[in-house]
Amino acid sequence: MFTINAEVRKEQGKGASRRLRAANKFPAIIYGGEAAPVAIELDHDKLWNMQDKAEFYGEVVTLVIDGKEEKVKVQAVQRHAFKPKLTHIDFVRA
């Protein structure tokens, strides 16, 4: 099972997302279930190594956000067109 540390995003929008990517992070979102959607930021290098494994896409992933654990599944992954970079991930609550 995969465990990922995440932080709630303080800023949203194109400029904020670009600043995140420049800081070696990238935006993501958690949605589904009864709770409201949550915009988060993730560390790029840690996720890049995890996303190479097929199990990352099929198993339940644990996100640790501000000390609380949230069980999610990967719904969609967006990658840069020609650079080895993740640009966004959608998670759905499990």
From Swiss-Prot:
GO terms under biological process: translation
GO cellular component entries: cytosolic large ribosomal subunit
Keywords noted in UniProt: Ribonucleoprotein, Ribosomal protein, RNA-binding, rRNA-binding
Record-linked Pfam families: Ribosomal_L25p (PF01386)
Keyword Ribosomal protein found: yes
Superkingdom of source: Bacteria
Coiled-coil residue spans: none
SUPFAM superfamilies: Ribosomal protein L25-like
GO molecular function terms attached to this record: 5S rRNA binding; structural constituent of ribosome
Gene3D superfamilies: Ribosomal Protein L25, Chain P (2.40.240.10)
Assembly, per entry: Part of the 50S ribosomal subunit; part of the 5S rRNA/L5/L18/L25 subcomplex. Contacts the 5S rRNA. Binds to the 5S rRNA independently of L5 and L18.
Family in the record: Belongs to the bacterial ribosomal protein bL25 family.
Physiological role: This is one of the proteins that binds to the 5S RNA in the ribosome where it forms part of the central protuberance.
Protein name: Large ribosomal subunit protein bL25
